[in-house]
Amino acid sequence: MPAKTIYSVCGMCPVRCPIEVDVENDECRFIQGNRQVPSIRGALCTRGGAGIPFVRDDERPQFPMLRKGARGEGRWQRLSWEEALAQAAEKLTAVRSNYGGRSVLWSDTGGPFSDLRQAFVRGLGSPNYFSAESVQGVNRQHAALSLFGFSDDQLVLDLKNAREVVLQARNLFESVHIQQANDLLDSLANGGRLTVVDTRATVTSSKADRFFLIRPGTDYALNMAVIHVLLERKLYDAAYAEKWIADLDELGRMTAGFSPEVAEAETGIPAADIEALTQALAKAAPKVVWHPGWKTSRYTDSFFVCRTAFIINALLGAVGARGGLPLAARPEDVGQKGLNRFGDLLPSVTEQRADGVGWKYPAFEGGPGLLHSALSAIPANDPYPIKALVTYQQDPLAELPDPQKLTAILAGLDFLACITSAWSETAWQADLVLPLSPYLERESLIAQLDGVKPAFLLRRRCASPRFDTRADWEIVGGLARRLGMESLAFTSPEDIWKFQLNGTGVRLQDFDAKGIVELTGQPNYGPLAEGFRFPTDSGKIEMVSFRWRRQGLASLGSLAPRDRPTAGTFRLTLGGCGLHDEGHTLNNPLLHKQMPENVLWLNQDAAAALGIKDGETVGVSVQDRSGRIRVRLSEFIHPEAAFTVPGFGRTLPPESRAQGRGLAANRLMPGGLDIRDPSGGGLALQEHVITVRKL
């Protein structure tokens, strides 16, 4: 078969970059970023380039498997797909019959290809759908909701046109988002300036004009000091604030105690540098982006950190502005029709959510949900029994804290099923493993991308599956057919795409040219239109959220100085890297070769005081939890911080490369399922202090 190029979408991390794949004889030969998409320009990160080695790897689930021993024992029976889907349908039917559809939890990647899976959960009669953002981004989402009345996915980071950018605990040039990285590089090339705030130096900080090596856990003090200066010096956009911001006087009272000098004592950042940054932001306004954070389940005040980042943008008139945070346009905003949704084919579910969102926590939204809250409620059957969990490309035992406790919780389920393309700690405990085809071997739904130029994006199958694996729509469609959801029982991707596109005026062949169909020729930057109202109680950006006040939650907090770790102890901090995305890439042949294990970053002076040398293996412990890991010493990490990349320390026998390599950071988080941000609802994964000792 002659070579051909297929436009598709990467699936190696949650960013999902548009790609083009050269295929010959039904085999993927070369993969690169989609050269026809602005800001991609053929670029692809290392993870994306490892998609072909993943397809060729034999150490992944190859066929449906039924557990034939104790959970975690590793004894499996191979099933046909007919047997596997029948088994899953039987187990789900039993749980629904005995406890109701609400007793099923579904943990999902979320994102633009998830509509059919969400509809399936609705068809089960369950309100308990959770996306990956419930672990990583819920504090950021709720911060936006409290201010604007909508989630942060309705805002665009216009990095390309920004003149001042602040990246706070966002290592954009290593934990790569190709489009945003290229846009930021374009901005810097055109005279834009970058400030990086982090507890250690990174590739991103090496590109910065200013680098603030901040004391871990003190970002809130920095942000409040910037707001204090903006208000006290009257550097904010007064006309914008008068029109679009509510409770500005109250914000002034809340920030009165956060002078740059107070922030310096807490953060270690000189007051003069805080003043200079604020002046520079005001000068560049409204073409300013203060990044609200990527993985924001860090501290018990991370909601406040995200919220103050958004507030700084708003005070500078950047919300709704080109070069700032313009509102994401939907197809309807440019005179087009959006995709049809599968959820509209089924009645809504009125049951209360197991995580308390919407009733116990009325301010929070059910989009991502609070998976940790739902799982923690299982032992007490509160608010009702939870008896089944289905995961789609998610690994709670590797992503959530305290997997020791969580394993015991999952043991109380009647049914645990995992739809996954790679082995995971959770799949190893499952009753049923349904192998998902790697993204190069499956097609997906059409995705709707809201933004300054709304578009539809299509993932096509590039090659036939090597093993007995299936696409997500095939698995969900097969289950739907067996459970009486005929409206979701699709038998071909073309039928799915036809349903989605009906009435939009877009045809399937329109994707042939470049894999993406833009719905407008000109970017839609705004500004905020006359008469526009934010969907908040006041119709404005609320410095004090009425919605949060009704739940008894604080919109902002007072200064709470952090304790300093004692000698030999460090605050455990986490972050991404350019090679791995949590745990599912660790056994990838290409990526493992380049980064086989994680290391623990320590400040070289702090380590010297303990007699620890670079490259040595040290012991780490928290309460009764302990492990070993190699250290990397640097002068460019805060002395109170210990940093590592999460996801390592795999225990799975099928993964010959990753098994036993590195340290699982989440195992050093005893009680972590119950340590949460009270105003945001998210986890606080960096509220753990570890002891490091020389061996």
Regions found by a protein language model. Give the residues of each.
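Flexible glycine/proline-enriched surface loops and loop-helix/loop-strand junctions
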Residues: A70, Q168, K207-A208, G257-V262, ...
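Acidic/polar loop patches that form or flank catalytic/metal-binding clefts of enzymes
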Residues: R29, D237-A238, I274-E275, V288-W290, ...
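Glycine/threonine-rich phosphate-binding loop and adjacent beta-strand/alpha-helix elements that clamp
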Residues: V156, L440-P465, I475-V476, A480, ...
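Extended redox/cofactor-interaction regions of prokaryotic respiratory oxidoreductases
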Residues: L116-V197, T204, Y220-M224, F310-W428, ...
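A glycine-rich phosphate-binding loop feature that marks nucleotide/adenosyl-phosphate handling sites
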Residues: T109-G110, K243-I245, L325-Q336, S492-T504, ...
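Long, contiguous, secondary-structure-rich segments that constitute the structural scaffold
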Residues: C462-T520, N588-W601, D605-L695
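N-terminal export/assembly segments and adjacent metallocofactor-ligating motifs
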Residues: M1-R233, V262, P270, Y392, ...
